[in-house]
Amino acid sequence: INVKRTVPLGLALLAVSNPMNVGVIDALSKMSHDPDGEVATASIISLGLVAGGTNNSRVATSLRSLATYYSKEPGLLFAVRLAQGLTHAGKGLVTFSPYHPDRTVCHPVVLAGIVSLMHILLDFDSLVLGKHHYLLFVLACTIRPRMLVTLDEDLKPLPVSVRVGVAVDTVGQAGRPKTITGFQTHTTPVLLAAGERAELATDEYLPLTSVLEGVVLLKKNPDHVPSALDEGKKTKKPGGKDDPISPSQIGRIAKPLSHW
């Protein structure tokens, strides 16, 4: 029985803040109706961890139905409310994942907080529903922002174009291989989902860090050469092609046409 209670926690540990793993969500949804209350509790909170900070609509709908299903069981209803809080944490701007967005480096403090929470959930009724509910504050060390914000050297917001796509493993590859695939171009600030990586779409600025996540400082690139499009925008004179036609110009154009 004890081994069965750890299965949902192990599944959640594999996909923290990664609701794109549909198989894990399906398995946890089935186990959330288990006759064993401990298994159901662990499955419900695991659903919240898998969708933590993502506002995932599928998990949110499942948790709302579970709140109705367990409306007369206070312990399980508390677990559902906790899972809902994890799902909508930070209004979708934070993550609980121990990995950085491109899943290349693990954050040890976040991993320690997640593992500590797993140990607490092994005895949820005695600890959290007893006198030690404050143990849930270990979640505080697991919360990290998942947005990318760019600032200039004066710490003022600096919107720039970035390409966001699925991270590609480039370890051991020669030359300068592509680091992302299937990218889309956005203007900062942007949100990075699990497994995504961002890179600057312009060489006008240089990042002061090699990993684009969280708050990134940018500085002007001294070797940047403005493109012809940028020069055209700066040197455009009044009366150009896009200027509106004045009434006097309309009269001069229409006067010769009146002879026809």
Which ranges hold each PLM region?
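Long internal repeat-built scaffold domains in very large eukaryotic proteins
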Residues: 1-260
